[in-house]
Swiss-Prot record:
This protein's name: tRNA pseudouridine synthase A
Family: Belongs to the tRNA pseudouridine synthase TruA family.
UniProt keyword list: Isomerase, tRNA processing
InterPro entries: PsdUridine_synth_cat_dom_sf, PsdUridine_synth_TruA, PsdUridine_synth_TruA_a/b_dom, PsdUridine_synth_TruA_C, TruA/RsuA/RluB/E/F_N
Function field: Formation of pseudouridine at positions 38, 39 and 40 in the anticodon stem and loop of transfer RNAs.
Organism the protein comes from: Shewanella sp. (strain ANA-3)
Organism placement in taxonomy: Bacteria, Pseudomonadati, Pseudomonadota, Gammaproteobacteria, Alteromonadales
Length: 261
């Protein structure tokens, strides 16, 4: 039996999604909880491996099991065995053609910036703090240069293991809600650190340190060293993964917090 799960987590206390020896990971916690409910070892496959400190409101995973359980066991039962900063939001049996990573047609991330002179207290792990006057209109206009299938070498981490730097960005929006700036970006897939590297460079435009054409210039340069520093991890959320309609997976509000679609 193959089961898909929708997962939400606060990544601030973990060394990323991927299971690692001797450090705490989201995958490790989930596999441990699932194995208790299934009464057998469970191995997970995910839609997107998030880095240390990065969060998710719409992560999707799947696993194989011989255990016969109802959906309540895979949600309430697993949640009872998870720490408070990880939660299963839904569970659904899927056919053998479904794969959390390879069946996905798009991923969507949101990066949340707290734009204020003083750092936040309550949301310090869930937003990135940047002071100074950020012009979101300039950021949004500049970001449109990223649309379409392009070579994103300038926005991939040096240690990125992808065989190709090409990705297809479907949409990118930069908006403001009061003191919060939200960068919302969707693509077929993302390179390692791609979203955070894009945000870091967009911020330079928003702060007036670079011209509107800078994103297009960076794409043409194909040189990571020419772009801005990587934005902090704590403002980044994986909010949605898109799959073909044949799988009929649940669609929940994207989040995080008060963010509107």
């Amino acid at each position: 039996m193959r089961i898909a799960l929708g997962i939400e987590y606060d990544g601030s206390g973990y060394f990323g999604w991927q299971r690692q020896a001797e450090v705490d990971s989201v995958q490790g916690q989930l596999e441990q909880a699932l194995s208790k409910v299934a009464n057998e070892p469970i191995s997970l496959f995910c839609a997107g491996r998030t880095d240390a400190g990065v969060h998710a409101t719409g992560q999707v995973v799947h696993f194989e099991t011989n255990a016969i359980r109802n959906e309540g066991a895979w949600t309430l039962g697993v949640n009872a065995n998870l720490p408070d900063n990880i939660a299963v939001r839904w569970a659904k049996e899927v056919d053998d053609t479904f794969h959390a990573r390879f069946s996905a047609t798009a991923r969507r991330y949101r990066y949340v910036i707290y734009n204020h002179n003083f750092r936040p207290g309550i949301l310090r792990h869930g937003v990135s703090h940047y002071h100074g006057d950020i012009d979101t209109d300039k950021m949004h206009v500049a970001a449109q240069a990223l649309l379409g299938e392009q070579d994103f070498t300038s926005f991939r981490a040096i240690q990125c293991q992808s065989k190709t730097p090409f990705r297809n960005v479907h949409s990118v929006k930069v908006t403001r809600q009061g003191m919060y700036v939200i960068v919302d970006i969707s693509a077929n897939a993302f390179l390692h650190h791609m979203v955070r590297n894009i945000v870091g460079s967009l911020l330079e435009i928003g702060l007036g340190n670079q011209p509107l054409t800078w994103m297009a210039d960076l794409l043409a340069l194909k040189d990571r060293n020419q772009a801005a520093a990587t934005a902090k991890p704590n403002g980044l959320y994986l909010v949605d993964v898109t799959y073909p309609e044949q799988y009929q997976l649940p669609k929940l509000a994207l989040g995080p917090l008060f963010m509107l679609d």
